[in-house]
Amino acid sequence: VGYAARSGMEFVTIYLGPSLVMIGWWWFLRKLVRVGRTQRVTSVADLISSRYGKSNVLAIVVTVMAVIGVTPYIALQLQSVTLSLSIFSDPTGTTDGGMNLVSAGFWVALGLALFTVLFGTRNLNANERHNGVVIAIAVEAVVKLVALLAVGIFVVWGVAGGLSEMMTHIDNSEIGQWQVDGSRWTALTVLSGAAFLCLPRMFQVLVVENDDERHLHIASWAFPIYLMMMSLFVVPIAVVGLDLLPENSNPDLFVLTVPLSQGQGGLAILSFLGGFSSATSMVIVATLALSTMVSNHVVMPIWLSFQGHGATVSGDVRNVVIFARRVSILVIIALGYLYYRVSGGSGALAAIGLISFIGVAQFLPAMIGGIFWRGGTRVGALTGLLVGFAIWIYTSLLPSFGPDVVLSSTLLEQGPFGIGWLRPQALFGIKGIDPTVHAVLWSLLLNTSGFILGSLISFPKPLERLQGAQFVNVFAHSGHAHGWSGSAAQSEDLMVMAQRILGGPEAQKLFRREAQNQGHDRYLPEPTPDFLQRVEREMSASVGAATAHAMISQLVGGASVSVQDLMAVADESAQMLEYSNQLEAKSSELLDTARQLRDVNAKLTQISVQKDAFLSQISHELRTPMTSIRSFSEILRDGNEL
């Protein structure tokens, strides 16, 4: 509503991007969900690192980027909750009503952190722990929709006097006069669609929690309808709020302040509950997803490096992971509160959200390229991510704090060291465009360019090529296991490690079932490549693909690629070499043909020269007697005496 009051119909782009993704990119979502299920990914960092050779370095980079990128998003939710609380002490929404918003934000952040720690980290397996959270998200979505529809119906028929009167109000309001900026609309639509795919919260719900691809068929039409209903009364509420409330009222709070100004306290409370539940669920799911990424891709690799080879058989890894996730939750929410404090907590909610959208959108090139292009490499993904993230920080995140907070006003206006074409919001001399469009343009353009160029100049490792084949051709490889040779592994060591990660009952159940499948009466199965792959995937659901791969590697002795996989790579290389030889042969034939054409052309040129010389000589011989005959004829004609 606040976005509509400030920018007119531009708020539609925030709903348009996700709707277009659900309607037009359902085939991409289906492939993404299939990859997530077959690879047992736990987060967007797990997806990207698993695709590019299960790289720990890449996983750490994506995790750090996600934490920093989502920090403004968490600050946005804290600001939303604290502003909503302040309304009940000042119904006009013009001041803070005597409430210390910074102090209130601290207590809100602390409460959300404690709730998330207590109820979000009781279990370890990422594929089992969030069923209740998903139900809570569905409930809060319904509550938010009901609250917004109730306020909208009250505004249209209870305040404006009916639909026709409401349309007249809209036509006469400032919102009806807003001009459409094509470049900004395009950028925001792309940005919202990218954020829909890349936000850790959305990825968690869309991919990690999705256990059936058929759910996408329902979501492809149900979710756009939900967004349409959410946006149905946004403009009427914004128009009535601008008409009824004081000029300095906060438009982000019109959903609360308009009912309160009309004496509808119950409706305002319903609206508050809808907004509060929405904000808290966003914070909880976002921090859960981020804490999983931090524990799996930052804490566990560091812990394993200190523990050495004994890390797989000693110590309770489950306790380490759970403790790391709890600490990560506290740190992540603390970072959100710190951003809220430093930025002053006074910016428009939508503007703060766009900053996070641009940050997480940097995952999109590596994600799409990894799923559709086998040529993408770890070097390319890392290059694109680092370049895009650096541009986002410089052009969007740091300027959002305001002048003279992080970046000086001189640097913002003149550029570093007076270099004008390096100004954060006029990079490379491009001036006069919207700051959001500017940040989206340069960050995604340079990110994609870095990804493509880095992939073209680097050669993927065998595991990268195997993972690339499984991602790109996921529907053909979903049921195939690749990657391990179990000759160096011991079943007893695998059992101890699995118990540390999965827990005793789950590990015993897994090993007993595998022994039965192999036809053994023994308790422990043979460490076949298929079984090693199954253990790795089960562990990846708890500690991430990269960490699980590293732990299995310690037991197997580093034999992370089987002979069959190496043969597959060799076959592929042979095919590429044969194709290259065919191209070389074709090129040689074309060169021979071109040489023959040049020889023929030279002969034709020589013949043409000879022809011209011959014609010139014949013409001279012909012209001489003909001239004489003509002269004598004229003399005979004119000379009668002769």
Pin down the residues of each PLM region.
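Extracellular/periplasmic helix-exit of transmembrane alpha-helices
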Residues: 30, 34, 151-171, 222-257, ...
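Terminal cytosolic tails of multi-pass membrane transporters
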Residues: 300-306, 400-525, 529
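Amphipathic alpha-helical coiled-coil "transmission" helices that mediate dimerization
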Residues: 561-613, 617
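Primarily the dimerization/phosphotransfer
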Residues: 602-638
